[in-house]
């Protein structure tokens, strides 16, 4: 029987933070930010968002070779604030892993002295932690496939 090779997907970061928006504000959350987006929201923060000829897009002139990690990138005030999640020039900074490896990394960021196994239901406090897929655009077919693989793992 031939061993099937698990497909790899690009992501920009996996991190743990507190949810800051909506009904679940304040909930501890593991995040995976996928790479790729079919939207390029260049009008954000522009003086005239209706006129693309006037757009100032700092990410276009940024020297990507000046950083080694996504975490070291600046947050741009104009255009898409997460353009690094879709602009091809930043692809070399992205993680490229199988869903199984991504799932393991998600569990690892949940591990603490009181949650040694990285469970989404904290064993002591019984506090639920969430998993949020973000982007880029997690609903693109690559994000959907990776998400399903992570859930299965």
Residue ranges and their predicted role:
Residues 2-5, 9-12, 39-153:
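Conserved Radical SAM active-site core
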Residues 27-29, 147-148:
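Short amphipathic alpha-helical segment that frequently serves as the phosphate-/nucleotide-binding helix
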